Amino acid sequence: QVGIDSLNGPSEVAIIVDENSSVEYAVKDFLAQAEHGEDSRCFLIHLPGFKLNLFKEVLEKNLSKSKRKEIINDALKNCCSINASSLNHAISLSNLIIPEHLEILIDDIDLNLMPKIRAGAIFIGTESSAVMGDYCAGPSHVIPTGGQGRFSSQLSLNDFFVKTSFMVASKNSYKKNGYKALLDNSMKIAESEGLWEHANALKE
C-alpha cells in the first residue's frame, strides 16, 4: 500500500487564446475536456481580438454532432469564458483557478513566463493539445485538480522513491560560534514549547 496526497477530479481545463488562435482547435479541446463527465470544468480565457461569437457558434455546431452531447451539455453548466486584457492578466486569472490542464494556444510564448504559472500540467503552443497528454505525449496524467496544484504536483517517478535526510553536527562542522548558535536557538524553541527535556538534551 502507498499513501496518496489527494483524490483527484473532476477533470478541468483552462484554455488561453488570442486573436490568432484557431477557434476550431479551441472548441475541440474545450469539448474534449467537457466530455469527461457532467462535473467537468472548462474555462476559456480570451485576449482581445479572439472571435468569441464564432467560438460559441462552432461549439454549438460540434456539440450537435457529438456522441456524448448529453454529458457535455451538463458539463457546460460548469464552464465559462473569461475576458483578459493581456497575456499576463490571463495567466493571473488562470493562477486563481490552478486548473488540472492549462492550454496556452498562442505561438511564440516567452518561456520566461513559465515559472509564474500554476497548473497541474501546461500545454504550450497552438498544436499542443491536452488530449495528447491524456494518452501518449506526457506529462503524467495523474494531475492535481481543484486548485491542489497550489501545493502538490503530478505523479512522477520521484513519488516511488523513499527519501531521507542526514545531519552531522559538531563544533568543527560550523563556522565560528555557529554550533553554539544552533544549540541556543534550538533550546529557546524547545523551552517556548514547554519541552524541557528537549532543551536539557542540548545543554553542554
Segments from the language model and where they lie:
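Electropositive phosphate-/nucleotide-binding environments in soluble metabolic enzymes
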Residues: 7, 20-28, 45, 49, ...
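Gly/Ser/Thr-rich active-site loops/lids in small-molecule metabolic enzymes
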Residues: 6-12, 38-45, 49, 53, ...
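Conserved short-loop catalytic and cofactor-binding motifs
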Residues: 18, 43, 78, 148, ...
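Conserved NAD(P)+-binding/catalytic subdomain of aldehyde/semialdehyde dehydrogenases
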Residues: 1-42
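C-terminal segments
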Residues: 111-204
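A glycine- and small/hydrophobic-rich beta-loop-beta segment
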Residues: 22, 32, 36, 44-119
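Alpha-helical scaffold segments in soluble metabolic enzymes
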Residues: 25, 29-32, 54-58, 92-93, ...
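Structural motif
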Residues: 12-15, 40-44, 79-82, 100-103, ...
